[in-house]
UniProtKB/Swiss-Prot annotation:
It comes from the Bacteria. This is UPF0344 protein BCE_1257. Its main location: membrane. The lineage of its organism: Bacteria, Bacillati, Bacillota, Bacilli, Bacillales. It holds the Pfam family DUF1516. GO terms for cellular component: plasma membrane. It comes from Bacillus cereus (strain ATCC 10987 / NRS 248).
Length: 121
């Protein structure tokens, strides 16, 4: 399940940057954007399934940390969607990029720090 979730995130980020580059170039990126929205659903479903499997065995404050990671992941998805919608409407995206970057760094840090992640920290 972890590998499906990581693969979904990788594909989601690739589709996000492809759609962003299409919107930046002034071309239509609607098809890629719709594919990205499908990946959002897959990311959320696999993340929720991981969270439910962790809740059964986690002890101490692990529930809270995984809950915060899930919240930050949803903020990343929201930030990605807001960036693309604002780009498609030719509106400024500075603040939304800030939300996206901060949430993405938080998700990556928590993903590497928590027990299921890699032991980098």
């Amino acid at each position: 399940m972890v590998h499906m979730h990581i693969t979904a995130w990788a594909l989601g980020l690739i589709l996000f940057f492809v759609a962003y580059s299409l919107y930046s170039a002034g071309r239509k990126g609607k098809g890629v954007h719709m594919g990205l929205r499908l990946m959002y659903i897959f990311i959320i479903v696999t993340g929720f399934m991981l969270y439910m499997s962790i809740v059964k065995t986690a002890t101490g404050s692990m529930h809270m940390w995984y809950g915060l990671k899930m919240l930050a992941g949803i903020l990343v998805i929201g930030g990605m969607e807001m960036v693309l919608v604002k780009m498609s409407k030719n509106k400024p995206t500075g603040a939304v990029w800030g939300l996206f970057i901060v949430a993405l760094v938080a998700v990556i840090y928590l993903g590497l720090k928590l027990p299921i992640g890699w032991k980098v920290f």
